[in-house]
């Protein structure tokens, strides 16, 4: 018995499948008047693994523009990062908001 997925002649079957790369989602921090700059930098370095200089640059963008991109990920990872930020902010008493948007 010939199985289509094991037959050497079926290579074209696999190449005909049109796969799209997964959509990308940006994780953004939103500015508020209470969360400290130090806490934002800590989140950026520990949750998003940004270098100190990058974290400071994103923190300043959040502070001056009201919103800053922390990174782009697949949907599941972006939502996990958002959850980590929100839980940590809540635990430490900060009103920091984090959103996920398709980019």
From Swiss-Prot:
Q: Name one Pfam family in it.
A: ClpS
One record GO biological process: protein catabolic process
Judging by the UniProt lineage, the source's domain of life is: Bacteria
NCBIfam families per record: PRK00033.1-5
Name the PANTHER family on file: ATP-DEPENDENT CLP PROTEASE ADAPTER PROTEIN CLPS, ATP-DEPENDENT CLP PROTEASE ADAPTER PROTEIN CLPS1, CHLOROPLASTIC
What does the subunit section of this Swiss-Prot or TrEMBL entry state?
Binds to the N-terminal domain of the chaperone ClpA.
Stated role: Involved in the modulation of the specificity of the ClpAP-mediated ATP-dependent protein degradation.
What family is this protein classified in? Belongs to the ClpS family.
Q: What is this protein called?
A: ATP-dependent Clp protease adapter protein ClpS
Origin species: Neisseria meningitidis serogroup A / serotype 4A (strain DSM 15465 / Z2491)
The record lists the lineage as: Bacteria, Pseudomonadati, Pseudomonadota, Betaproteobacteria, Neisseriales
